[in-house]
Amino acid sequence: MAVLVIAEHDNASLNDATHKVVTAAAKFGGDVDILVAGEGAGDVAAAAAKVSGVRKVVHVDGASVAKQLAEAMEALVVPMMSGYDAVFIPATTTGKNMAPRIAAKLDVMQLSDITDVIDTDTFERPIYAGNAILTVKSSDAKKVITVRGTAFEAAGEDGSASVEAADAPAGPFKSEFVSEQMVKSDRPELAGAKRVVSGGRALGSKEEFDRLIVPLADKLEAAVGASRAAVDAGYAPNDYQVGQTGKIVAPELYVA
């Protein structure tokens, strides 16, 4: 039995979400391999090789997978699945984009946003905005699974996996990367932050939000969060939104 984990990264560093997905994959059982697909992502592959419990890292370098678009990743991953029982993907924007296409090409049901692995066929995932837990059983021979990283501890970094090179899909593909606008911040990334300070509509204005929430977050070296109502009212930008329609968080300290 073997599991393929698709690494979340920016071609420069390995996102901690990958470590958490490795923990979930280990609960599934069997050997765990990591796929690092990107352009100039050698450092990412080296970091992935150090993740505990990983057998090997498959490093695919090429312009076609630089941004891990769904078409290119499907063309890469689907042929690889002959050697794997499941593919585990972080439930991030990138992961949620590629997983449905991979599942469709494999003709299997995607298992989304899981929070626990019961056995090789049975998984848990939240429903009704997290107010209930659904147990899902799949009879598909191949599993395509997105993982809610906040539900799992991060794997350690005492591994020494081998790194193997593989070819990138040639393309061309119908979709292509045009541009991206990244929000730059010195704060921790909200979804993975250990400390979060969050504000809601009761603060009354953007000025009060900035006066009360931001300085406290600075003191605690925390990420800043906001409720949907606060975001809709213009107190905070969309990328601060926490909850069902925003970022899922599981910090050690949450102040609201």
Show where each model-derived region lies.
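N-terminal glycine-rich FAD/FM-binding segment characteristic of electron-transfer flavoproteins
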Residues: 1-256
